[in-house]
Amino acid sequence: MYSLPHLSIPVSHKFIFESLMSNQRQTQYVDGNTLTVENLVQFSTGKFILNLTPAAWAGVAASRKIVQNILDSGEVAYGINTGFGLFSKVVISPDKLEILQDNLIRSHCAGVGTPLTRNRTRMLLALRINVLSKGHSGISTLTLQRVVNAFNADCISVVPSQGTVGASGDLAPLSHLALGLMGEGPMWDPETGQIGEASDIMKRNKCVPIKLKAKEGLAMIN
């Protein structure tokens, strides 16, 4: 039986370590700072439920408030109400901000090849949740909660194994990861282990697809 080495983790972080052979799902708390490789291996098994620490949730909310303040003020800020790359100086009208974020994800779904295994993709999703829990991205608590809910329901997007160089974040893999959470594209069915439509699988597992608001598409992939 594989067992984890002793790890010195503050009790306040509420980490409860179990062997990978345990059938009981334990809740593990992430905060963007204390995740270990051992935790990540655990999360790959699908036997753990994720949540953020209260402090991490507060940080996420505070970060989103900054984004909202920028939107309310009409201030121009890159990635919030502008285009990207060569279009960074193009100001996007408020009524187009959500579709901009959706299209950012769709346009970067350029991966090819055999899909990553479910275990590896679980780790990818857990890593993204951990990064977002730092409270630096501007994602809303509502969107992040839906991402966490999908992980806990084992609704895992299908992510191709090839198609990125990792130059500015792993844009293609993370876009495929986000696309499934939007209820689009393919997803692993937690009941059968087969690939199906994300919209159907999320609905059957009572998961609400994420609806990206200003800045949130960028937060999901960069």
Where in this protein do the model-derived segments appear?
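Conserved, well-structured ligand/cofactor-binding cores
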Residues: I9-N222
